[in-house]
Amino acid sequence: MSSPTQEKLTLMRYIELLEEDDLVVSRPSASYDQRIEFATDDSRQVRPGTLFVCKGRAFKCEYLLSAIADGAVAYVSKVDYDVDLPAVIVSDIRRTLAVVADVFYGHPSGKVKVCAFTGTKGKSTCSFYLRGILANEAKLTGCHRPALNTGIEFDDGIEAGPSKLTTPESFLLQSRIAHAAEAGAPWLVMEASSQGLKYERTGKIAFEVGAFTNIGEDHISPIEHPTLEDYFASKLKIFSQSRFAVVNLDMDKVDRVLEAASRCERTVTFSLTDERADVLALAIRNGDCGVVATVRTPRFTRDIVIPTPVKFNVSNALAALACAEALGISEEGIVHGFEGVFVPGRMELYPSVSGKILGIVDFAHNGMSLETLLRDLRENYPERELAVVFGATGGKGVDRRTTMGIAAGKYADRIVITEDDPGPEDVEDICAEIARNVQAQGNDNWQIVTDRVAAIETAVRETVRPAVVIVTGKGEEERMLRKNGPEPCERDGSILKRTLAAYDA
């Protein structure tokens, strides 16, 4: 992460700003006019003049000693370590991280219009759609392209690459917003995960628009959210730091969402069916280049072509359009903003040469996403066998084994259950639990193939033509989390493409 270009502040100024948020428990007795040249929570990045933040349940004193050896001039921590270095002891290290990162990078969200999506499903697709609209607007107006930070990839105007987290930690996230400002990007589009909101990774970021797209049961576990209420409340936090709100009137618990959004200057609503919505889909039909939606907004009514074979993405498109409406983007910028938008690992199509099999790779990794996806595919391809390959994560989100099993059992003709980041658990046990929920729907056409490559091959080889074979859960990912940690794995799309070529008959 690079250093910001603005004037460096003193240690005392950092302390004063932390005190404004009532975070300081104790501070150095002397007045320190030492200028802070760098700030980080990663001991490997420390350089002379660094303010080092001690973070995490797994933090070890040796990390602090390493930071001191490399030139740290002070540290911030919940714990007072017995070291010869000025210490700022705080009550909440997560909130402190957000403050220090925001201060060090010069409050970059005040220089870029940051637009954030939260929701159980569709955050990445919404982000790419809005990025497409804003990129089109940039071409029309001659300004810099928008920046992007999603769970798939990031492009902050200076650096770009694959992402490791949906919403990264405060220092990395603030550095990307700072890069966007430095590059001259007017907007940055990002995903705000429930974990990112709950644990203050997004703290101190001023969102120009905060969008809440949907809510379902997911990420409920001892290491994520203990209850659905905690999960929901974490997502609602997005409005506490947003200027404008965007809300889906079709979502569950919408009254509470609208109440939380009422603190914002303006709320723009969208819906597939509710006439009260500011942005409404009047009609939806399949077209030659995707789904065509006739959309009514406060300023115009137009047909919009969304490059997707399934209708559920219309809701994601409406969310992006509603954000664009809140931002005041032009009609032409919006209407043509979806053209050519490609979301990696989401509804990637791999038709076989013979046309007998349509292969699809998608990221659907919870029951809500999988049910919506399979239901739409069943409607679109009623004459084809619908085969699905999927698994569920280990060590977290255990409810997915139930909800995904139920969804597959209800809608799929052929089911191959396999591994999907089993982590600390035995993949066989996870698959067996999914299978019980599939069978509970009266669906007996399932099998367990724990090796993911073999599972995809099995689905393609055994499906009855004509068929749709959909592989879900991993998308663009190239690593599998197993007991010994992350291991390299082949992309689902690569496996599917190769397998279709081998078994296309």
What would you call each of these model-derived segments?
Residues 1-99, 103, 280-282, 309, ...:
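N-terminal leader/targeting and accessory segments in enzymes
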Residues 77, 91, 150, 192, ...:
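Short loop/edge segments at beta-strand edges and connector loops
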Residues 36, 48-49, 72, 84-85, ...:
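Short, well-ordered alpha-helix to beta-strand connector turns
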Residues 81-84, 181-183, 198, 208-359, ...:
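Acidic, Mg2+-coordinating active-site environments of NTP-dependent enzymes
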Residues 79-81, 151-152, 215, 272, ...:
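Short, ordered loop/turn segments at secondary-structure junctions
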Residues 1-23, 48-51, 57-59, 115, ...:
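ATP-dependent carboxylate-amine ligase
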Residues 50, 67, 100, 117, ...:
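Residue-level signal for inorganic ion chemistry
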Residues 97-249, 253-266, 381:
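Phosphate-binding loop of NTP-binding sites
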